[in-house]
């Protein structure tokens, strides 16, 4: 073996070990890295909800999940109540680490028949967009949270889209993104998300695929995926890749096929005894799926 081959082999093996993978075939890992620029990160949904910010960053560094979506009202404490100096400290903590603060996971919603409630959610979205900018993040996750039965569906869809356009204009002006999670009773059905986005005009408003069972309704995963993929942003939410019956390998195949290069964010629901080991396991499963795509 010549020197270049030896060096190439060493680099391949080092990269695999650093990602927490079982050393299978280094050339397969090299092919995987060439094939996709997707990255696995963490939503502080269950596995990170009780970690303060230094612990959260350290645990993500330790496990190779190098992006974080900060879910609202969790132990990280990153909220709009932070002072300017505290916001600067959050930004510095991420900057001094290998972990990216992808954004904020809020519960703002725009479907209510109560217009005062809708306005409160819009203004709350804007306040948290300011927070995201000041901590070095790039956007905020929001969601439709249903479609009320007592209101014509078309009216609610138009109201959600109009709210997203207002928030999106504000976001675009400060270099942020609105990430709309596919969520909510009826609203999470892909044709309804499509109907919302057909009325969205702001380029800073993007869709966050959420791996719901409704994705599989006729005409099926691939057709539903293709019907909305032009609106995808830089985040996707998944659950544990090796738990349940959602066809994650098929989904990863679709993302690789479209050369998706965003964050695949783990929104885990289980309660493992060792969350660090579980995070490492999910990274290994993710890398294998991308390698097989």
Residue ranges and their predicted role:
Residues 54-61, 84-96, 126-134, 252-254:
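Short amphipathic alpha-helices and their capping/turn segments at secondary-structure boundaries
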Residues 33-43, 101-111, 147:
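N-terminal small/glycine-rich loop or linker at the start of catalytic domains
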Residues 14-16, 20-23, 93-100, 110-207, ...:
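Active-site acidic/histidine proton-transfer and metal-coordination neighborhood
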Residues 56-73, 136:
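Catalytic domains of carbohydrate-active enzymes, especially glycoside hydrolases
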Residues 2-41, 48-64, 187-293:
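Histidine-acidic metal/acid-base catalytic patches
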Residues 71-91, 144-151:
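Glycine-rich, proline-tolerant flexible connector loops at the mouths of alpha/beta enzymes
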Residues 69, 103-105, 141, 237, ...:
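Conserved beta-strand positions in the central sheet of alpha/beta enzyme cores
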């Amino acid at each position: 073996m010549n020197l270049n081959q030896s060096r190439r082999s060493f680099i391949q093996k080092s990269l695999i070990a650093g990602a927490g993978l079982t050393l299978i075939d280094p050339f397969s890992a090299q092919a995987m890295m060439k094939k996709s620029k997707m990255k696995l990160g963490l939503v502080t949904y269950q596995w990170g909800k009780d970690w303060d910010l230094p612990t959260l960053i350290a645990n993500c560094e330790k496990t190779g999940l190098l992006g974080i979506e900060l879910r609202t009202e969790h132990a990280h404490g990153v909220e709009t109540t932070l002072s300017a100096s505290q916001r600067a400290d959050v930004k510095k903590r991420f900057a001094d680490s290998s972990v990216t603060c992808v954004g904020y996971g809020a519960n703002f919603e725009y479907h209510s028949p109560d217009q005062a409630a809708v306005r409160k959610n819009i203004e709350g979205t804007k306040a948290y967009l300011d927070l995201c900018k000041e901590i070095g993040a790039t956007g905020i996750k929001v969601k439709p949270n249903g479609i009320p039965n007592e209101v014509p569906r078309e009216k609610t869809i138009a109201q959600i889209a109009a709210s997203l356009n207002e928030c999106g204009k504000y976001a675009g002006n400060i270099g942020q993104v609105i990430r709309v999670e596919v969520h909510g009773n009826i609203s999470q059905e892909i044709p309804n998300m499509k109907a919302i986005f057909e009325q969205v005009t702001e380029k800073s408003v993007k869709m966050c695929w959420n791996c719901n069972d409704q994705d599989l309704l006729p005409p099926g995963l691939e057709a539903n995926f293709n019907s909305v993929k032009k609106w995808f942003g830089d985040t996707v939410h998944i659950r544990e890749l090796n738990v349940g019956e959602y066809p994650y390998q098929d989904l990863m195949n679709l993302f690789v096929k479209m050369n998706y290069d965003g964050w695949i964010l783990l929104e885990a629901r289980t309660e493992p005894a060792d969350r660090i080991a579980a995070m490492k396991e999910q990274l290994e499963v993710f890398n294998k799926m991308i390698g097989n795509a």
